[in-house]
């Protein structure tokens, strides 16, 4: 069933393209399957976390730590060494100013970093959509599947080699819409120094 849904999503995103994506049908399908893989690994845990937050069993701080643990563990299952950090407009890396999230890779160590701008997140679905999108960028970046034509297009405000993760973002928002709710996240002040160790390759 997932395979059928993935193909349907790819057809929809091919017809209603979210940006200057030059990949063919199979390239977009591969990206869609990546989002499905992540959901298959993390979906149950994320749904339980969302339910706990929505029912006020946990607060925003517990939620963000729970999400960090789930995403970093799921990343390991996908062969990714992911660190999820929560920043704000003033502490986001300079080349990510204005972005909701970003994806960085340390090419020497393979470690990856996803900073989230908490000032731009107002709901659970926005947060999860952004995380799924940035992981899609990381996977494509590590595999060398980035669309340089998009990166060179100055009109799209992308600073790196963009894989156009909008379909992954939309996929996650739809998957988690049932238990969506507003959230006010705080930042990880002690994590800010991590960003200087990475270059934004993607």
Residue ranges and their predicted role:
Residues 1-2, 125:
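Hydrophobic, membrane-inserting alpha-helical segments
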Residues 2-12:
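Short, compositionally biased, intrinsically disordered N-terminal export/targeting signals
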Residues 85-128, 141, 157:
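Active-site scaffold of zinc-dependent metalloenzymes
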Residues 178-202:
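Charge-rich, low-complexity N-terminal segments
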Residues 143-182:
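Post-HExxH zinc-binding segment in Zn-dependent metallohydrolases
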Residues 130, 134-142:
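Catalytic glutamate of the conserved HExxH
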Residues 42-108:
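Auxiliary, metal-adjacent structural segments of Zn-dependent hydrolase domains
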């Amino acid at each position: 069933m997932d395979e059928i849904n993935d193909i349907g999503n790819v057809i929809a995103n091919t017809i209603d393209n979210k940006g200057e994506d030059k990949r063919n049908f199979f390239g977009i399908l591969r990206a869609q399957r990546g989002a499905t893989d992540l959901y298959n690994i993390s979906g149950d845990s994320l749904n339980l976390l969302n339910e706990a937050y929505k029912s006020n069993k946990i607060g925003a701080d517990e939620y963000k730590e729970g999400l960090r643990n789930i995403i970093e563990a799921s990343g390991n299952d996908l062969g990714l060494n992911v660190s999820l950090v929560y920043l704000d407009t003033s502490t986001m890396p300079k080349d990510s100013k204005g972005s909701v999230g970003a994806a960085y890779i340390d090419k020497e160590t393979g470690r990856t970093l996803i900073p989230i701008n908490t000032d731009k997140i107002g709901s659970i679905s926005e947060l999860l959509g952004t995380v799924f999108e940035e992981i899609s960028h990381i996977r494509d970046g590590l595999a060398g599947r980035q669309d340089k034509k998009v990166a060179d297009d100055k009109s799209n405000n992308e600073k790196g080699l963009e894989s156009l993760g909008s379909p992954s973002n939309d996929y996650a928002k739809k998957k988690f819409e049932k238990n969506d709710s507003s959230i006010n996240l705080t930042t990880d002040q002690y994590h800010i120094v991590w960003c200087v160790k990475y270059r934004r390759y993607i």
